[in-house]
UniProtKB/Swiss-Prot annotation:
The protein's name: Zinc finger protein GLI3
Post-translation changes: Phosphorylation is essential for its proteolytic processing.
PROSITE patterns linked to this entry: ZINC_FINGER_C2H2_1, ZINC_FINGER_C2H2_2
Function text: Has a dual function as a transcriptional activator and a repressor of the sonic hedgehog (Shh) pathway, and may play a role in limb development. May bind to the minimal GLI-consensus sequence 5'-GGGTGGTC-3'. Has an essential role in the early embryonic patterning of mesoderm and neuroectoderm.
Disordered: region residues: 1-79, 414-461, 625-731, 899-921, 1202-1228, 1335-1364
Biased composition (Low complexity): 1335-1350
Keyword match Repeat: yes
UniProt keyword annotations, A-Z: Activator, Cytoplasm, DNA-binding, Metal-binding, Nucleus, Phosphoprotein, Repeat, Repressor, Transcription, Transcription regulation, Zinc, Zinc-finger
Molecular function terms from GO: DNA-binding transcription factor activity; DNA-binding transcription factor activity, RNA polymerase II-specific; RNA polymerase II cis-regulatory region sequence-specific DNA binding; zinc ion binding
Family annotation (SUPFAM superfamilies): beta-beta-alpha zinc fingers
Protein family: Belongs to the GLI C2H2-type zinc-finger protein family.
Compartment(s) of residence: Nucleus; Cytoplasm
Biased composition annotated in UniProt, kind: Basic and acidic residues: 637-653, 678-704
Length: 1569
């Protein structure tokens, strides 16, 4: 051949050249000719048409005159055909190689056959590829799709005759680009068959490229497979030449001619050529310049035979490069078309310009051992190819059995390890094997063993043993790492001709033969004969040894096959475009086809976490995703480095076991790919692998599922299904759970998840700290720290002192969730160094104030807080915590993380009770005003919007506003007042109480319940007089209220609660009350705040109440006195501020209670009445109206001399009459009860009103109201048999202490008793008093005192006469709360009630403080009973909780229900406080029929219409009050005096409508006129 080429003369060459140039007609060239042509793509061989058999086609003497007629577009034959034809190819002889007259553009040098070098002045006869431009430069033009190709005439092809006969050089291009251009080495012509490397390479090349791609592309590039490795060219020279070519026209212009310039024949040829190169038909090694990270498009341009390059370019500007580079469109060049890439299209296209010089030996190794199929040798992508002998395995032609997969060449594991040692490429993350992965995310793409490839693991040099070409090939299956045909099963050495036969043999003879033992006995299997759990697992495992890949891609043009079905499924997503794995980071919509990619994305993009740690001893590498880790393990540590199953369970997560041979990591090093044989890529079966693949990492649920979180299946981001990007099946890479390592101990996280609502747990004391320091989560903490820094910029002092670990609370087990909080709660070490600084509690409180605010917390880390958790507070994040229970020794969840909202890892946003520390100020203990201040401070600190102004704020005096906005009163450590009493007093024991009883929710009977769940109201008889939900004033030491406050009626409409209301006022009420109290110093009267009409109305109403109450009290003092055996101690303990209960205050409070509540500042959850609330949600007006309605738990012991001595005297006298002992007590009571008498500020007048009301004015509110308002006095008069209820911590009153003589002696006790009992007392007074009195008689009957008072009382009660104690009256009126004459039910219920009371009385002193069954107790006692039970229920163990539990309770309860039904008369139901608000003064008396509305519920439920939304139908209000699902805890419904429906009402609305409501409020006031 070489001689012949030399023999041609220059003149001949010129002649031939001319003829070629002039020849315009094109001979018809079949696809086969094109495929086999070694010349330009547009081989214009003037000779005969070429046939598929290259030898013949190329051997045919080209005839210059003939033009290429038509090119058949039939796709190239299958790999099988190609394989069979490879050796049949003959090159037509090239007779003349005309000497180039002029160098082609840029300098296209024709190869001088004499020396194999390009001589610019030597023009081949063929002018071989004048039409080919220099290789396509990979530059911006390509990426932008702006590279245009200019087709040029194709000269006739002249092939030297010698070449034609040489089977050795079928595909060799005829010119070689060499910077040398040195003809001196003419003797070295590579075309010389004797060339030492030609034969091996040619055979190999032919076997690899039976299609024209090799010859055409190689020639097109001016690069001959033989020439490249030629010893005459140095890497530097070759690279230099490549560089020269890079600037010239691309030889592909002819292959991909522009439509305009390319003739139809040319286009056909090009298309044909492309189809021939199509991966499905002509799989070729794929050398991806840079594997793309992008998912593939669902459509594949090559799937259609009519592939249109222009269309592809138009569709994806970067697609051209993708095609050329076989890349899935790298990140730089997006627009990839799925698995299609240049390499997929043609091996020729795979020949990227190798930036790195490739030495002959390197080339040899690459080709032979790596099977990069020439593509690697002539690597397309310079950046990826490296001179290192180990080139990333490129795709071998799947159909060519002779072609060994890069992996097939199983260089011994050691070799593999060496070669695999991170050739930069293999080390390059996700630049996986150039041939195998085009960075395609489908790991399996590389895995297909070429069917014909023999397992070359034995070849020491990486020389692949090519078995007879193509006999064994699985036509479309890509080259596998292993193509085993010999059985290496223990004791079996059978050899088979095909892999299929081997597989069949193994399955039938070995696997099924050992039916009960699923053990791989393959020699050298890394599983070490560990049995599989199931047969299918073993079957799948064996594919690793045999290289079988039964799962083939069904998409046209894709020849990928996988050994595992899940890998195929993942791969198919590259075709379908399905991306089921969506980034879990909120706001990020990226989706991925596999979980591994998502994990990688999340960990790289949204965090710096690298949870996947290499477990190989001494290796400290960490990765963001399992695929990268697997790749690292395979690449760096070798195939044998995979972790065995036994390691999986270890604390130390094992490194991911190497992928199955078919699923190699993206950049699998060549040696590693041989793992299929040696290393057990899938040491586990699917199941195992699944387990492994899950990586057992449970990403911490960050606040918004931001950081790497478990994939949809709960698996960690590492998903079993291999992500196309991660080219390896997720073998089980386990997250390093070592606290010292990667992600820290996630088990710890699982136990104590980072609190969602907490602020960065590590940086601020605001969050509960995980039980362990999780080093692995430090990144999370860092994120939170960054987040906090932003906030801290605004909150510089945000809890500057980290929470002390020493005082950490014991695990709260109340909910079964144990959270060790570092937050110092209770009186623990001051967590809040500066009271002016927002503490964690403060922040918590702020968040709790935002009832609906699941996301309000700006502090809560976007990463670490659950979006669902409302608060940043570790403790009170429950956005609707119905009760922040105190920690005063009670077992309650600090942050009921699991209580009710399993979604939130932190505190349940609706936890019915977030516990609060006893003594530490908490939101729950704040008054609305304080809350407002806190919110304002928080807003100022965080730059947030100011809080919604308090109701009536516009009417508040400047002083009051300043007080609201000013710092809280002397709180010990924070702006928040200390918690003296439970928020709802549901805890029973206030911080000051020496002891308290278990709350219903603490008992199993009550259990934890969702705040919104209705609660069977407990009779409050056991509770310490329930205090305001926020304990607003209870926890605050209010300023002294000057005596002048005669009628400090809070003019906030319908504040109808007394200080001692068993159902403490809601926040709304507290707000108003707080404001008033804060102004108390200024002695602002209602007149200061309310319109004259309102004031007048309130005054008139109060007068009536005073009178009624006074009368009742006087009448019943003596009898009631007997029940009083309270010790001043408990009273004192209850006393939060004696001063606070000045007469004015009482009056103020009461009047305040009469006003409608508008303040909706806090979430309903915070205002909820704890489970101890009245069973029916009825709020007994008596209690509500009690002067101490807000201070139910406050046994304020007023030692102040009553301002209204007269009323006291009257009451005293009255008591005296009924109870000889009463005088002293009464005196004390009255003295002490400035609270009621003085506070009422009305003295006699008030009593008179009460008397009038209770005795004669059933219309006034049927004593239910008078009891509500008057029983304060009456109970005063009746210091209460409820004296039994020792409501204080010192509630140690017991049956033994029933001595009434002591009662007489305990003067203050009466007051205290009265004060404490005010709430319960009213109930007792209204319901239980009879029974209690009798109980006093019964239990304390030994005491004549008791007997006297009690008897007199009972007798009067039984008489049913007008002289009946107000109890009977109250009970009747209460029963008839609907406004009906109390005798209606009196006849029926009173005697019955009395009986019941008698029965229950017996239980009075037997009450077990622990027995919180009061909820089930009859609300028989109805509102009063309920109030009573609610108040007593926790207040004293001694007080008979069981009073409410008598066997006859059901009947009483029925009565209550009846009453309730009466009360719920829709015609009378109006918005809370409707009784006061809209009715005119005239209506009030008659309309105050005790309409029962869940006042607190409505008030606290911010979802209702605006605060003053105009007239609402009573039924609506009723529904709101009783049925509001928003209510965290049903409150006792307020029994409001009925008001004609016609009158307009106020409804509690959203805070958002507060402004509007304020405006409407004025309107309402106007209406009042």
């Amino acid at each position: 051949m070489e001689a012949q080429s030399r023999s041609t003369t220059a003149s001949e060459k010129k002649k031939v050249e001319n003829s070629i140039v002039k020849g315009h007609s094109r001979t018809e060239v079949s696809e086969k000719a094109v495929a086999s042509s070694t010349t330009s793509n547009e081989d214009e061989s003037p000779g005969q048409t070429y046939h598929r058999e290259r030898r013949n086609a190329i051997a045919m003497q080209p005839q210059g005159g003939q033009g290429l007629g038509k090119i058949s577009e039939e796709p190239s034959t299958s790999s099988e055909e190609r394989a069979s034809l490879i050796k049949k190819e003959l090159h037509g002889s090239i007779t003349h190689l005309p000497e180039p007259s002029v160098p082609y553009r840029g300098t296209v040098f024709a190869m001088d056959p004499r020396n194999g070098y390009i001589d610019p002045h030597y023009r081949s006869d063929l002018d071989l590829f004048p039409a080919f431009h220099p290789p396509v430069p990979i530059d911006a033009r390509h990426h932008e799709g702006r590279y245009h190709y200019e087709p040029t005439p194709i000269p006739p092809l002249h092939v030297p005759t010698a070449l034609a006969s040489s089977p050795t050089y079928p595909d060799l291009p005829f010119f070689r680009i060499s910077p040398h251009r040195n003809p001196a080495s003419a003797s070295d012509s590579p075309f010389s068959p004797p060339h030492p490397y030609i034969s091996p390479y040619m055979d190999y090349i032919r076997s690899l490229h039976s299609s024209p791609s090799l010859s055409m592309i190689s020639a097109a590039r001016g690069l001959s497979p033989t020439d490249v490795p030629h010893a005459g060219i140095s890497p530097a020279e070759y690279y230099h030449q490549m560089a020269l070519l890079a600037g010239q026209r691309s030889p592909y212009a002819d292959i991909f001619p522009s439509p305009a310039t390319a003739g139809a024949g040319a286009n056909a040829l090009h298309m044909e050529y492309l189809h021939a190169m199509e991966s499905s038909r002509f799989s070729s090694p794929r050398l991806s310049a840079r594997p793309s990270r992008k998912r593939t498009l669902s459509i594949s341009p090559l799937s259609d035979h009519s592939f249109d390059l222009q269309t592809m370019i138009r569709n994806s500007p970067n697609s051209l490069v993708t095609i050329l580079n076989n890349s899935r469109s790298s990140s730089s060049a997006s627009g990839s078309y799925g698995h299609l890439a240049a390499s997929a299209i043609s091996p020729a296209l795979n020949f990227a310009y190798q930036p790195t010089p490739v030495s002959l030996q390197q080339m040899h190794q690459q080709i032979m051992s790596r099977q990069h199929s020439i593509g690697s040798a002539f690597g397309h992508s310079p950046p990826l190819l490296h001179p290192a002998p180990t080139f990333p395995s490129q795709r071998t032609i799947p159909g060519i059995p002779s072609v060994l997969n890069p992996v097939q060449v199983s260089i011994g594991p050691s070799e593999a390890a060496q070669q695999n040692k991170p050739t930069s490429e293999s080390a390059v993350s996700s630049t996986g094997d150039l041939l195998h992965n085009k960075r395609s995310k489908v790991k399996p793409e590389e895995d297909h063993p070429s069917p014909g490839a023999v397992c070359i693991q034995d070849q020491p040099d990486g020389m692949t043993l090519v078995k007879e070409e193509g006999v064994k090939d699985e036509s479309k299956q890509e080259a596998e790492v292993v193509y085993e045909t010999n059985c290496h099963w223990e004791g079996c050495s059978r050899e088979f001709d095909t892999q299929e036969q081997l597989v069949h043999h193994i399955n039938n003879d070995h696997i099924h033969g050992e039916k009960k033992e699923f053990v791989c006995r393959w020699l050298d299997c890394s599983r070490e004969q560990k049995p599989f759990k199931a047969q299918y697992m073993l079957v799948v495992h064996m594919r690793r040894h045999t290289g079988e890949k039964p799962h083939k891609c069904t998409f046209e043009g894709c020849s990928k096959a996988y050994s595992r079905l899940e890998n195929l499924k993942t791969h198919l997503r590259s075709h379908t475009g399905e991306k089921p794995y969506v980034c879990e980071h909120e706001g990020c919509n990226k989706a991925f086809s596999n979980a591994s990619d998502r994990a990688k994305h999340q960990n790289r993009t949204h965090s710096n976490e690298k949870p996947y740690v290499c477990k190989i001893p001494g290796c400290t590498k960490r990765y963001t995703d399992p695929s990268s880790l697997r790749k690292h393990v395979k690449t760096v540590h070798g195939p044998e480095a995979h972790v065995t199953k036994k390691q999986r369970g270890d604390i130390h997560p094992r490194p991911p076991p190497p992928r199955e041979p078919g699923s190699h990591s993206q950049s699998r090093s060549p040696g590693q790919q041989t793992q299929g044989i040696h290393g057990e890529h899938k040491d586990l079966s699917n199941t195992t692998s699944k387990h492994e693949e899950c990586l057992q990492v449970r990403s911490v649920k960050t606040e918004k599922p931001m950081s790497s979180q478990p994939s949809p299946g709960g698996k960690s981001s590492c998903s079993r299904q291999q992500s196309p990007i991660s080219n390896y099946t997720n073998s089980g890479i386990e997250l390093n759970l070592n606290s010292g390592g990667s992600i820290g101990d996630f088990s710890a996280l699982d136990e104590t998840p980072i609190m969602d609502s907490t602020i960065s747990t590590a940086t601020t004391g605001l969050g509960l700290h995980g039980r362990r320091v999780m080093t692995g989560t430090k990144w999370m903490e860092q994120i939170k720290v960054e987040k906090m820094k932003q906030v801290n910029g605004m909150l510089p002092r945000l809890n500057p002192v980290p929470p002390h670990r020493a005082p950490t609370l014991p695990p709260i087990t109340g909910n079964g969730v144990q959270l060790n909080s570092n937050i110092s709660l209770g009186g623990l070490a001051p967590v809040l160094p500066n009271r002016n600084d927002l503490s964690s509690m403060d922040i918590t409180v702020l968040n709790m104030l935002n009832r609906r605010d699941s996301n309000t917390s700006t502090i809560s880390s976007a990463y670490m807080s659950s979006r669902r958790s409302s608060g940043i507070s570790p403790c009170f994040s429950s956005r609707r915590s119905s009760e922040a229970s105190q920690f005063e020794g009670r077992v309650q969840n600090l942050s009921v993380a699991g209580s009710y909202d399993p979604i939130s890892t932190d505190a349940s946003r609706r936890s019915s009770e977030t516990s609060q520390c006893d003594g530490l100020p908490t939101l729950l203990s704040l008054t609305p005003a304080q809350q407002y201040r806190l919110k304002a401070k928080y807003a100022a600190a965080t730059g947030g919007p100011p809080p919604t102004p308090l109701p009536n704020m516009e009417r508040m005096s400047l002083k009051t506003r300043m007080a609201l906005l000013g710092d809280s009163r002397d709180c010990r450590l924070s702006p928040l007042p200390s918690v003296n009493v439970p928020r709802r007093c549901s805890d029973g024991g206030v911080g000051s109480y020496g002891r308290r009883h278990l709350l219903p929710n603490e008992l199993q009977v009550n259990g934890m319940r969702r705040a919104s769940d209705p609660v069977k109201m407990v009779s409050d008889n056991v509770s310490n007089t329930r205090v305001v939900r926020f304990n607003s004033l209870n926890n605050v030491i209010p300023p002294d209220v000057p005596p002048p406050m005669e009628r400090r009626n809070l003019s906030l409409q319908n504040y109808t609660r007394n200080v001692y209301s068993p159902c403490p006022p809601s926040i709304s009420e507290n707000v108003a009350l707080e404001a008033m109290i804060m102004e108390a110093e200024g002695n602002f009267d209602d007149e200061d705040l309310l319109p004259d009409d309102m004031v007048q109305y309130l005054n008139s109403r109060n007068q009536r109440l005073y009178e009624t109450i006074e009368t009742d009290a006087l009448q019943n003092n003596a009898g009631e006195r007997n029940g009083n055996n309270f010790e001043q101690s408990h009273v004192t303990s209850n006393v939060i501020n004696e001063q606070f209960h000045s007469s004015e205050q009482t009056d103020l409070i009461e009047n305040k209670n009469d006003l409608p509540i508008q303040w909706n500042e806090v979430s309903s959850g915070s205002a909820e009445y704890s489970p101890s609330r009245l069973k029916y949600g009825q709020r007994f007006p008596t209690q509500q109206n009690q002067p101490f309605g807000l201070y139910n738990n406050m046994m304020v012991q007023q030692q102040n001399v009553p301002k209204s001595g007269l009323s006291q005297q009257r009451g005293y006298q009255h008591h005296t009459q009924n109870n000889p002992q009463a005088p002293q007590q009464n005196l004390d009571l009255y003295n002490n009860s400035n609270v009621w008498s003085g506070q009422l500020g009305r003295g006699n007048q008030y009593i008179d009103d009460i008397e009038r009301s209770s005795l004669g004015h059933s219309a006034t509110g049927s004593l239910c109201n008078s009891a509500a308002r008057g029983q304060k006095l009456t109970t005063n008069g009746l210091p209460m048999n409820t004296g039994q209820q020792n409501f204080g911590p010192s509630t140690h009153y017991s049956v033994q202490s029933a001595n009434r003589a002591e009662v007489v002696q305990n003067e203050n006790i009466i007051n205290q008793e009265f004060m404490q009992q005010m709430t319960a007392e009213h109930l007792i007074y209204g319901m239980h008093l009879l029974g209690v009195t009798r109980s006093n008689q019964t239990t304390s009957g030994q005491n004549g005192n008791t007997t006297d008072g009690t008897r007199s009382f009972l007798s009067t009660t039984q008489n049913g006469g007008e002289q009946q104690p107000t109890l009977a009256k109250n009970f009747q009126s209460f029963v008839n709360s609907s406004g009906n004459s109390r005798q209606n039910l009196h006849r029926n219920n009173l005697p019955y009630l009395q009986e019941q009371i008698y029965d229950t009385n017996q239980h009075i002193f037997k009450v077990n403080s622990i027995k919180m069954e009061m909820q089930s107790h009859p609300q028989q006692h109805c509102a009063n009973a309920q109030n009573f039970s609610g108040q007593l229920y926790d207040q004293t163990a001694t007080y008979p909780q069981q009073i409410m539990k008598s066997g006859s309770e059901p009947g009483m309860e029925a009565n209550c229900l009846l009453q309730e039904s009466n009360n719920t008369n829709s015609s009378k139901l109006l918005s809370p406080g409707a009784n006061h608000v809209t009715s005119t003064v005239d209506n009030i008396d008659n309309s105050l029929a005790g309409v029962q509305i869940a006042f607190a519920a409505i008030i606290d439920d911010g979802d209702h219409a605006s605060l003053i939304s105009g007239v609402l139908s009573p039924s609506i209000i009723q529904n709101l009050s009783r049925n509001s699902s928003r209510l965290t805890t049903p409150r006792a419904s307020l029994t409001f005096p009925a008001i004609p429906v016609s009158t307009s009402n106020m409804a509690i609305g959203d805070m958002s409508s507060l402004l509007t409501s304020l405006a409407e409020e004025s309107k309402f006031l106007a209406i009042m006129q």
